[in-house]
């Protein structure tokens, strides 16, 4: 019986190591990022900025994100996108003290009522659409800049997701606030199980 538990434990470790770095668009764990701008931090009542602010905002959103982690993993596999990046984008789209609520035909921001959190934060089709738009932007960057690295494609795709397809004109445009904040949140979420 103990050999069975040992085998199951080894399989779980192998699965963990395989899923800890996947996605077709760069390795977020190896990316350096300055995190959220001070404007983002101040906008959400924080008196600090950078990675610390991004991590705090992701931490606030984590209880809601965890409910949708299996959905993000499924969608991540479909689009070959790291679920931590998907979670980082969703966290950025629902900053700090606000949460996204599925209102049927639209998504609305509402104040977090604490223990009375909504049962439906965001739908699978909305998460899928968000991920599809991001991967489309990344592929546009790949076509426009074929010599860039996968990490540059991810950064470029995140900046283009936020600023539009024409936002990225050179490698100097890869440090937009949206990208820096999302990557810092994604790295934090990755360390916490995404």
Curated annotation (Swiss-Prot):
Gene Ontology process terms (BP): defense response to Gram-positive bacterium; peptidoglycan catabolic process
InterPro entries linked to this entry: Glyco_hydro_23, Lysozyme-like_dom_sf
Gene3D superfamilies, per the entry: 1.10.530.10
Annotated GO MF terms: lysozyme activity
Location of the protein in the cell: Secreted
Originating species: Homo sapiens
Keyword Transport attached: no
UniProt keywords, alphabetically: Disulfide bond, Glycosidase, Hydrolase, Secreted, Signal
EC identifiers of the protein: 3.2.1.-
Signal peptide per UniProt: 1-19
Keyword Nucleus annotated: no
GO cellular component terms listed in the entry, alphabetical order: extracellular region
Gene: LYG1
Disulfide bonds: 24-80, 38-49
Descriptive protein name: Lysozyme g-like protein 1
Broad class of enzyme this protein falls into: hydrolase
Family note: Belongs to the glycosyl hydrolase 23 family.
